[in-house]
Amino acid sequence: VTSQVPILTAPTAAGKTALALALSERFPLEVVAADAFTVYRGLDLGTAKPTPAERRAAPHHLLDVVDVTQTYDVARYVRQAEAAIADVLARGRVPLVVGGTGFYLSGLVRGLPLTPPADPAVRAEVEADLAARGLDALLAEVERASPAEARRLERNPRRVVRALEVHRRTGRFPGEFGSTVPAFAYRVFAFTWPWPELEARIAARVGQMLAGGWPQEAAWLAAQVPPDGDPRPTVWQALGYREALAVHRGELSPQAAGERITLATRQYAKRQLTWTRTQLGAPPSSPQAAVGALGAWLGRWPSGEER
């Protein structure tokens, strides 16, 4: 039985990459990214993807694996991440899963739901309902059948459509189908900052990204994948890209865009913290405590600690 694989998770802008790189100076680490948008080639600035220099400092896996015109989902992520973890372990090094996409982390830790494959006809029907009646009406439909499922979907249109597509076909929601068995056991190390500090970090990073070429990156993305396609393209669900595009087009000032993106990012960070506590069972500590605990645990790796 392989020892537990460590996961380092924190909300957006908390400094996960910096912390992982600091640990890589002390341990033979390779980073396995767990982020729904750094998988896309060309989405660099707006996703705060590790820079070439950071990627030279420690090997990174699961970055730049698909083109923006391609679809990518949690099942594909889990397959590729498990293959990367196995490869790192086979070379006698330590895989450190680093990221904040809760859905991806849950797929690794808890397995993938054994839901039926998509049915394009039913999905088209649900998407037509979404366009005609709006998200709230669809969420109300879920709520009537299962309040817990409605909460779990977090107002994410893509997940609401998927849940209703499955429910209308089977009478069950995706979470009711059970899951695959995870390939590895994991140990989650979660951290965050006091909320005012995290808010300040988010605002500062959004400002830097908008000044550093994000609007141009959003314009490049729009040329590859029109933002208003139907169904809504997955890549355009990445936070802030629509606002960055509006800056490029002269429709929003950088300041107004920054305020909107900062607000949306703060809301996302709160959802990430909730997911970490409720779905991963890992109450976040301070960055200092997390790096101390993870460093001590890595010092005992591969035995680590038994659960």
Regions found by a protein language model. Name each.
Residues 1-307:
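Phosphate/pyrophosphate-binding catalytic cores of soluble transferases and nucleic-acid-acting enzymes
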